[in-house]
Structure formats: structure tokens, C-alpha cells
Amino acid sequence: MSKTYIERMSIDLRPAICGLGRQWEEMVPMRDGTRLRTLFYMPDTQGPWPVLFSRTPYLKNQSIYEYQGKIFAERGYGFICQYCRGTGGSEGAWVPFQNEKIDGVDALQWLQQRDYIESIGLYGFSYVAYTQLAVLDQLPPKVKTAYIVHFGTDRYGQMYCNGLFRHDIYTPWAKDNSGTNRILPYEAALDAGLYKPHIDADRVVWNLNLPWYREWLSHPDYETPFWKNSFWEELKAIPKKINIPVYFGCGWYDHHFGGMMCTYQSLSDYAKAHSKLVIGPWVHMKELCIEGHDTTDAYVGGIHGYEGALNWMDRCLVHGEIPEREVLAYGVGQGWRKLDQWPGSSKPLRLYLSEAGLAVQADCQESVRNYTYDPTNIIRTHGAECMCYAPLSDRGSVSQPNPNVRDDVVTWLSKPLNEPIVIDGAVKIHLSVSTDAEDTAFVVRLMEVTPEGKSYNIRTTATTLRYRNGEGRADDYTPDSRVECELTMWDILWKLQTGSYIRIDISSSSFPEYNIHYNTAEAWAMQQNPVIAHQQIWMGGESGSYIELPVE
């Protein structure tokens, strides 16, 4: 039987050293007079205490916060949890992400004045991590560190992949956090993702009015005021202003992984020199998710859970330590590795798409691989790094179908490896493509095929032709013209064994990981008339398609 979230997080948790003392609630005032419901849990020892502070919109998780309050108090720490504006008994209107900066700053200033608080460590997971990231450039003196898990500061990159909206994450999340108590089953929530035009889905399918969700749908272009002249742009700049040690925790197959890597790479020199990065083999709720490999040792020592948080807080809050930089990454096929930096040092291995498969040299003559993409006959996502609500069996790295199961998926295989290779960093793809449609999508999947013939997905990425530049800026496309697409997959640390094959699949759909592209140039959320597209992948010659692996 699989463990619950609390059970997973409590693996190897140290024994209690005291009891849970006083518990109480207060309505803490913000600068505009709005009061936010705040829960307090303190040890039964003499204060003042080091305190962990969280801000959350998730009333459904109150039992988790109560458990955290108990276990942290029993180990000498206070725990304070505040509900975001308009949630969990707090006053005001709930608009996701909008008020967390100002309210977070006000809450910390209020805590700074409490004499029972000795020091503060910010503690956040997912949206709760966002509420902490939002204030890391405006901290009062008592805040000494932050423990940030599964969130990042590149919101645009989290929501869109080269013009494709990440339905599995943000469509069910919008419904579940719409201010109603009605939680839909996953498949029912995805009905909205299939509705055309999708811009009307909240009102027609859910009978709700979610203007903030429609704003997300309406801005696939980064070069707009919605992204550039808003707090989202301010959020991207915060890592450069951080001047405290921060623990960053993420999973290879968590949907916030890409955003967290952007955050980590953007840190100020001081913050990077004194922060810790931990990357594990799990999805969002810390479930292990890599088939074909035994990763149970990933939980040893509780590095992923409450014990890992306490170890970090001990160093920064109790002992007053300023840690030196640490990078700890779980290599698939290797186990935990201590690294000097991330990504590590690597050299590029280029493999060309050719008539014979993946080759170390490009074919001299140009050739083309064709397939037909029908948006009414989509591929359902099975295995992915950027999914959250799908069943666990469809997330992470899972066994894949054999090649040639579908006519609209084309496959290239390398020769069997003569020795192991380790992918260390971001795989890059150069696609040379054309289509007879006004616009279309291409989905690229990298896999390992084991000597036993089992295929496992490693990384996936995708692009539309309008957003093929990778910069969030639309480019025109003329049907039947040949264009070049530069794609970058998320980082990975993965050892391919001797005798394995490298496999690349290219298709044009992966729903609900990405929205269904209907092969028109109309804004994606307005599209409602599917068009069949005839796709070409160009190989060989001077500008044929290839992949580039960073290998140790």
C-alpha cells in the first residue's frame, strides 16, 4: 500500500524532545485593515522560540498544518500558519497570486514585533512556497532563512511551453481553487480542456466566472503587459535580490521543476554560495515515479521531508550557521550524488535524425519523414515531467508503447550503447520542419530503451510554430515553408546503461500535458474548428534535425 503524504514526509523523523504547548488563533491585520486568520502552535518550553512560518490558501490541507504544528512544536520550533486573503476564514477576496507580496510583507512585519519569536524560517511547499518567494526581497531582521519546495519564479515558463498551455496543471487547479467547495473528478475537470473555444469553458462547462483563469488563457505571448508590466516580472527579479541562505527542494518530475531551476540559476552570488539545492526522483507530492529503477533509497535520512527541513532550520535558526553551497541530486540509475554545481560539467553528444535512426553523423542527402496529425484523434499523455493532477501511473517516467503503434508518431533509435553514458543537464533539440497548416505543434520525447526492450520516457518538450523561437514571442509562419525550431528540455541526471538504445519520438499532441492544437493561426483559446495537418521532419544535409545530449 502506498504511503500518504504525511507518512512520506515523516520518514526518519527524529524523536520529540518536548510537547505541544499553547495553541491559538488570531486575526492578523494587513495595511488595508483586512484581517487574516492565523494559527499558532508553540512548544511547551520557555520561549522565545525559533519559528517556522507558512502562508496558504488551502483550507483542505488544515489537517496537514495541524500535524506540522504538532511535530515542529515537539521538536522545539513554533509553527505559524496564515490563510491567504479570502481563504480559510481570512477576510477579503480571493484572487490567486495577487495579494501575496503585500500581505506577506505585512504579516512578517507583524511577526517581527512579537517578543515570543526569536527567529523566523519561512517554510513553503507549492503555492505556499510561492507566498515565501514573493517576499524574499523584503525581509525583516528576524527572518534568517527560507525552505522552498516545488515552486519557481518563472510563471510564464510554468504555464506555457513554446505557445502550448499546460492543461493538466492549471485547468483542474483553476476549478479546485475557484472559491467553491465542489471538487470535480480528474476526468470531469479535463472536460473543460476539451471544450471549444476554451476561453468559454469556465462559464459553460463549470458555470463559474473566473476572469483570472481567462487571463492566463489569453496571454500565450510573453511580450505583453500581463507578463512584462506586472508582479510576474517582479517575481522573476527576486532571486537576484536574495541575501539569506535558502533551501531549494524539487523533483525531476515535479511540474515546477523548470521554474525552480530558473530561480536557482538566477540567485545572487551570495545566495547561491550559501544555499542548498536538492533534486529527488519524485513528482509533486513526493511520490516516487521512475519505473524500471529502484529509487526507494531516495527517502533515506528523511532528506525529502520534515527531517530534512528540521536539519536545515537547526543550522540556520538554532546554530546561527551560514551554510556553504550544497547540491545534492538523485541520478537515475546512480542514486544520490553530491555535486559541486548544477548543472555539472559535460560535453555535447550530437545525434542526427537520419533514415537509419539516430546517427553520430548527418546524412549527406536531405530526406523527410512524413505523418498526418488529426486534432480529433489525439495522443493521451502517458508519462511526463509536467503533470500534477493525472493519476500517478501517467506521471513521471513510465513504460512506453513500442514504436510504430500509431501512424502519427515517428520514431528514431540509436545503435545500442557500447558503454554507459550519463546525461547531465538540458537536452537540446534542433528541428527542421514544415507543414501545410497555418500553424501546428510538434512534441518531442526522449526515451531509454533497455537491453530487454522496455522503453521509459526521460524528458518531453513541445513547440508551436508561432512560438518556435523559445522566447515567448510570436513569429509568422507560411504554410509549406521549412523552418528551424530550437527546443530545450528540462535538466536531468540519468545514466543510460550499456546495451540500451536512445529513442526519440516526434508527434503533434500530448493531451492533457499540453492543449490540443487545432492547426490554425487563431489564438489557441479561441480555436474551435480542427484542421488536419500534414507534417514533415527534415533530416540530413546542412540543416537537418538533431538532438544534443550533455554527457559526463
Put a short name on every predicted segment.
Residues 124-134:
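Glycine-rich nucleophile elbow surrounding the catalytic serine of serine-hydrolase chemistry
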Residues 74, 137-241:
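Accessory cap/linker subdomain of secreted extracellular hydrolases
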Residues 8-45, 413, 417-419, 477:
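N-terminal cap/lid segment of alpha/beta-hydrolase-fold proteins
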Residues 44-112, 288-298, 438, 444, ...:
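Cap/lid segment of the alpha/beta-hydrolase catalytic domain
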Residues 115-126:
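Alpha/beta-hydrolase fold nucleophile elbow
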Residues 258-275:
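Active-site-adjacent alpha-helix of alpha/beta-hydrolase-fold enzymes
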Residues 242, 248-250:
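Short beta-strand/loop motif that positions the catalytic acidic residue
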Residues 9-10, 199, 287, 293-552:
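C-terminal, loop-rich substrate-recognition/catalytic regions characterized by aromatic stacking residues
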